[in-house]
Amino acid sequence: MARLFSPRPPPSEDLFYETYYSLSQQYPLLILLLVIVLCALVALPAVAWASGRELTSDPSFLTTVLCALGGFSLLLGLASREQQLQRWTRPLSGLIWVALLALGYGFLFTGGVVSAWDQVSFFLFIIFTVYAMLPLGMRDAAAAGVISSLSHLLVLGLYLGWQPESQRALLPQLAANAVLFLCGNVVGAYHKALMERALRATFREALSSLHSRRRLDTEKKHQEHLLLSILPAYLAREMKAEIMARLQAGQRSRPENTNNFHSLYVKRHQGVSVLYADIVGFTRLASECSPKELVLMLNELFGKFDQIAKEHECMRIKILGDCYYCVSGLPLSLPDHAINCVRMGLDMCRAIRKLRVATGVDINMRVGVHSGSVLCGVIGLQKWQYDVWSHDVTLANHMEAGGVPGRVHITGATLALLAGAYAVERADTEHRDPYLRELGEPTYLVIDPRAEEEDEKGTAKGLLSSLEGHTMRPSLLMTRYLESWGAAKPFAHLSHLDSPVSTSTPLPEKAFSPQWSLDRSRTPRGLDDELDTGDAKFFQVIEQLNSQKQWKQSKDFNLLTLYFREKEMEKQYRLSALPAFKYYAACTFLVFLSNFTIQMLVTTRPPALIITYSITFLLFFLLLFVCFSEHLTKCVQKGPKMLHWLPALSVLVATRPGFRVALGTATILLVFTMAIASLLFLPVSSDCLFLASNVSSVTFNASWEMPGSLPLISIPLISIPYSMHCCVLGFLSCSLFLHMSFELKLLLLLLWLVASCSLFLHSHAWLSDCLIARLYQSPSDSRPGVLKEPKLMGAIYFFIFFFTLLVLARQNEYYCRLDFLWKKKLRQEREETETMENLTRLLLENVLPAHVAPQFIGQNRRNEDLYHQSYECVCVLFASVPDFKEFYSESNINHEGLECLRLLNEIIADFDELLSKPKFSGVEKIKTIGSTYMAATGLNATSGQDTQQDSERSCSHLGTMVEFAVALGSKLGVINKHSFNNFRLRVGLNHGPVVAGVIGAQKPQYDIWGNTVNVASRMESTGVLGKIQVTEETARALQSLGYTCYSRGSIKVKGKGELCTYFLNTDLTRTGSPSAS
């Protein structure tokens, strides 16, 4: 009792669930109090009208009802206040329980003769409501139910045990009462256990759904950052839609296209300035760096450039080795795009100048800028990189190549847009770049107004750095200085976004303390500022689970019927399996068994009743056998084959809604029928019939005089009130089928209400009159009270149980549907989350190789440091289509070059499709540079792995690259056939050590660096159309693998001097494999 009135809730598994459970039970509690108040209001005029009495004739009943009306109205007011209810749930529940007990004992000891069967139904109502409608835990509810039962038995046993006239039939009646209370406790506990299980399941589904939503939100943020790190927003949305379509269709490759062309995501923009910048002297410096130093240096340098680009409204396009190029005026047009690029170029030169002065390392910056129009977008299927194409882009590239270190080199078009913002001087380009010399247009060098001041300030620092440089490598000195710039690391945002992803992330307990109302209109000021978005969403979830929501407009449910608004969802709900049906049937059998025991205790057990019960028992055993037949699987398998189908009956019941509804309805009707069996088979005495006809016409006054002495002993009238109690148990049997539809429960309850009231108020009302005549046959007895007459008492309790169970049925229906809805939402969200995760992985693998992506995603993310990896043997391929430069033109016919890029997109996309073939799984696409395709093999090997294996095995992937190059030529031949062109492939191969890494926080980019890469690029640029040119070392490695190579001789290679190169003995213009010796 002390625990029940404690203001603090008992410790529970989950404080979140306690808050949710408290809210879910508020509605049944309010309904219980409302039913009691309404019954008190209706009882007075209804009873007076039904019995033909005046209210003043029964002052005890009138007083008790008025006290109940006042007391429970006060409790209703307290329970309707949400904040107080959450804080004082247990004390208020205890107070209601005590008030119900007091009301029950008030009815028991007022209004006439006290009998053993008196107010048993009301105490049964108390017991059931303690379990089903009061917000108590199972232990508290069980304690209250047992105390209510024992108190009634002990009080009546002690009170009636001293009365000689009551002792003869007292023991069977008390035993019948005990069976009734035991059944009520079991049914109540069973109902509560089912509801709590359903509530907890719904809560867990909702909580899982919340975590899924947060995870989904995180994945969406990942995608947003990943896409925007590769593409502009307008292009990201368009391409994301296509990827989602692929993933939802279960296809990793592109969907079938009716026009046989790959999707082209390229648009033309005018009024754009393009900046190319190259770090002069970096190649020599990089050769002295360790892999970690090289990647750190590049990331810091290009991170600084990205920062400068952002300040001047420029967008970096791509990083090509140590070359950086960007544009201004994309994707939105900017009037000052030329000024933006010039300012950025000057700031880049200043940054490198400061670096040179501070470290003493001889590096410089060469910048070229041109203004015009571009085609911008993405081509290919893999390793997307936003790029720009046009003659103006080519000119900007040559402006950088023909520029002066430390200066910004601009064209006349850019100069015209500067409008005198900067002073310039004429540039001498005759001896620098053939393209510019052939163009014949004048170019200019921008004069930096702050260059002289910075040079003077940096002289002292430069001398100091030069002294330190004598004891420190230039690369190390450079690295240490660049670390002070603090450039962001690639994909650093992923770690910040991952905090809410884990489903085990707890939410703050303060957000769910009972004194905090979940009504957002009452949320304390400043609370929203303290809670993060996830917590606010959890408040919304709790509110959505509130049982009061069933009476409010919902986008998922129909307000009146609770049907799902989506017909397909309603169909799925009704067809869903119900494995727990067998337990519903088993508990209903307990109610049936209780009715049987009660009737055997209080009736004369006529043969017809025994025969009927025997048949009903057989039907029930058959029903239970069908429901639990799956537990006989092992036994049946050992028996004859003709019995192997028996376990399928249980599955049939669980999965077939029609069969299940039929069995459930039949079970309840059996309980209904047998509840009144004793009444139907009650023997009739002519004396009792005579009495009944006279009693009904007697006018009841304060002193009731009976017409003579009548033999009533032969009639077992004591079974009349117990038949009424059995009818009440029949009502309770409907509550056991938790997943039975509300409309069916309504129909069965209404049917049983009409049948019960018809029996007790009409066809068999005379039996109640006989019992009253028996109890009040002495002239000294006062008139019986309203709740002392079985027929009136039964009708009142029938209506009370009818409305109570109807409300519970609607609540059960709401939670069953809500549980189904949350499970469906959770499945959808998990599928969507899985799709989003796959999309994130696909996007990340579109930026990074598959073996590098796990470094930045998943639970073992290691992006605290820059990713870098050195390899001893990597084969690098450069494959270009030089003829495309001549093919490309800009005219109205080809939409200013757009149709030319459409063909290039087909070429690159067909090349990309080769990567999905298993034989080329080891080939990694690095990037495309115009019409040049760069790829590498050997990057999926771990560092140092090559040195631990023999040379032949370590370079075996060179053969894969050769096969890939031949496949590229075959693909190009097919495109030539369909496009009526004669493009030819020029390929350069080289193998050796490289450094791989990821650089750039704004647009992370995976790249490889080293002499091997530079020489491979030279092998392509100095190669011959239709041939694969390789270095001498690579030729020897290929010959060891069985390929035939022949010498081309010595050629002059920029930056390398004279090199002896070889051609692979194959023709890329024909489909086939290279010849092998």
From Swiss-Prot:
S-S pairs: none
Q: What are the annotated glycosylation sites?
A: 694, 701
Give GO cellular component annotations, separated by semicolons.
cytoplasm; dendrite; plasma membrane
Where do the annotations place ATP binding?
A: 278-283, 320-322, 366, 927, 1007-1009, 1014-1018, 1054
Give the UniProt keywords, A-Z: ATP-binding, cAMP biosynthesis, Cell membrane, Cytoplasm, Glycoprotein, Lyase, Magnesium, Membrane, Metal-binding, Nucleotide-binding, Phosphoprotein, Repeat, Transmembrane, Transmembrane helix
Transmembrane stretches, start-end: 29-50, 61-80, 94-117, 120-138, 141-162, 170-190, 583-604, 608-630, 661-684, 718-738, 746-766, 793-809
Question: Is-annotated flag, keyword ATP-binding?
Answer: yes
Phosphoserine: residues bearing it: 517
Q: In which broad location class does this protein mainly occur, judging by the first location in its UniProt entry? A: membrane
A Gene Ontology biological process annotation?
A: cAMP biosynthetic process
Q: How is the cofactor bound?
A: Binds 2 magnesium ions per subunit. Is also active with manganese (in vitro).
Quote the record's activity regulation.
Activated by forskolin. Insensitive to calcium/calmodulin. Stimulated by GNAS and by the G-protein beta and gamma subunit complex.
Catalyses which reaction(s): ATP = 3',5'-cyclic AMP + diphosphate
List the stretches on the Cytoplasmic face of the membrane: 1-28, 191-582, 810-1077
Enzyme nomenclature, EC number: 4.6.1.1
> Any ranges marked Extracellular in the topology annotation, and which?
685-717
Q: Where does Mg(2+) 2 bind?
A: 278-279, 322
Q: What does this protein do?
A: Catalyzes the formation of the signaling molecule cAMP in response to G-protein signaling.
Domain characteristics, as noted in the entry:
The protein contains two modules with six transmembrane helices each; both are required for catalytic activity. Isolated N-terminal or C-terminal modules have no catalytic activity, but when they are brought together, enzyme activity is restored. The active site is at the interface of the two modules.
What name appears for this protein in its UniProt entry? Answer: Adenylate cyclase type 4
Q: Which gene encodes it?
A: Adcy4
